[in-house]
Amino acid sequence: MVKGTPGIVNLEGPVSERLPNRDHLLLWNAPAALAELSGLNVRIAGIANNHSLDAGAVGAEQTIEALRNHGILPAGGTAGAAVLEFNGLVIAVTAHDLTQGVPVNLEADLAAARQHSAVLIATFHITGPASFLPRPKLRHAVEIAYHAGANVIVAHGTHALGPVERRPHAVIAWGLGNVAFACDCTQEEDAMILRVVVGSDKVVSAEALPLRAGLNNRPARPSPEAAAIFDLLEAIGSSPLQRKGTSAFF
């Protein structure tokens, strides 16, 4: 991340201690991880995903409180939209889980978030086998977000990359992969960071930065195969890329 620039992540699972009597806890984040995220200037964490209730409803509420105590705004679930003011712009960030389908209240949620913000960032969590191509329900949700005025639309959850796309008032990243993930459920190492510069109701620039995901306690690194990642993105239907070494603008 650029120093001083706020970061947005999906936090997969609750913040919780692993206790002997909580065998049902499938995926969780150690409380100490929040200080690390805060140190990286992560300002917003989406908490709407298929593991958000792994510590139960109480665990989900405790996660919201823990994030706020570390200066990180939660987005999604009972927290609703996160609203951040940065460089004079009011930025709203929403997070929705599509595991059970497109939420019936999605359009209303996005309209409410857009009403009082200069920039709307809509994020979606989608589950299923790793695939470079977006699933129908993700396409449906993205179209709703675009027509609701979202300027940046991002999907995550299948552990796989997806195309990047530029439209008149928005950019779309159809799949980011993972930055860091300690789970035997995936071995997908290709990932990317989306870096955007925004103005009021517009995206000034959008840049894809390929990563090698930090899986199972290995650190995330810039991808040594950035050119191959760009080839892949173009092959699966991305908007034209302007390559600049290890990053590409679109």
Q: In which residue ranges do the predicted regions lie?
A:
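Acidic, metal/ion-coordinating pockets
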Residues: M1-F250
